[in-house]
């Protein structure tokens, strides 16, 4: 789950320390900035389709947050969900027919089907703002993403600290 606070049921989802024996890194991208990119890259857009896999809780979380930000900007937002990869083509086609621009959050199912999405969105002339680099390189026009390399490196440092007898309940959660 992208938001560890949601996964752990923490009251303060923005806290950097869990207070329990859990630590690590998170790959949550800057969602407010990604939402702003929609307006920046497609300034005439009025309708935004958010395309994601309904089976991925992290994607639903991102869709909710980005959707709220886009609505605050005065854009009409509609979510288009696929339960699995078999539904992506039909859902993408529907989303493209009803949207000026698509937002695809960090989503494993969508990432593995980026070519399918691109084969539908590009001929339809519907640009895609992506939640991460992999989706962007497959079907997007822009992203503002995190670095999986940096996250992995930081996780390695944290693992070293744990193995060197640090106390995980004192260690802050970090995002890069």
Name what the model sees in each region.
Residues 138-139:
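Small-residue-rich helix-loop
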Residues 1-7, 24-25, 128-132:
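Short beta-strand elements of ligand-binding domains
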Residues 70-84:
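Short beta-strand elements in bilobed, periplasmic/extracellular small-molecule ligand-binding domains
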Residues 81-96:
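Structural motif
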Residues 1, 48-51, 99-110, 129-131:
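Periplasmic-binding protein-like
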């Amino acid at each position: 789950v992208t938001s560890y606070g949601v996964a752990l049921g923490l009251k303060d989802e923005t806290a950097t320390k869990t207070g329990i024996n859990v630590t690590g890194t998170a790959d949550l991208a800057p969602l407010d900035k990604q939402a702003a990119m929609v307006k920046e890259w497609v300034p005439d857009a009025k309708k935004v389709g958010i395309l994601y896999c309904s089976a991925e809780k992290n994607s639903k979380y991102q869709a909710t947050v980005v959707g709220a930000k886009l609505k605050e900007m005065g854009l009409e937002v509609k979510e288009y969900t696929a339960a699995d990869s078999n539904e992506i083509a039909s859902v993408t086609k529907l989303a493209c027919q009803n949207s000026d621009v698509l937002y695809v959050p960090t989503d494993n199912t969508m990432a593995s089907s980026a070519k399918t999405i691109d084969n539908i969105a590009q001929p339809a002339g519907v640009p895609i703002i992506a939640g991460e680099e992999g989706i962007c390189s497959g079907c997007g026009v822009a992203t503002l993403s995190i670095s999986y390399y940096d996250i992995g490196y930081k996780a390695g440092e944290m693992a070293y600290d744990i193995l060197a007898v640090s106390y995980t309940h004192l260690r802050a959660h970090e995002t890069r």
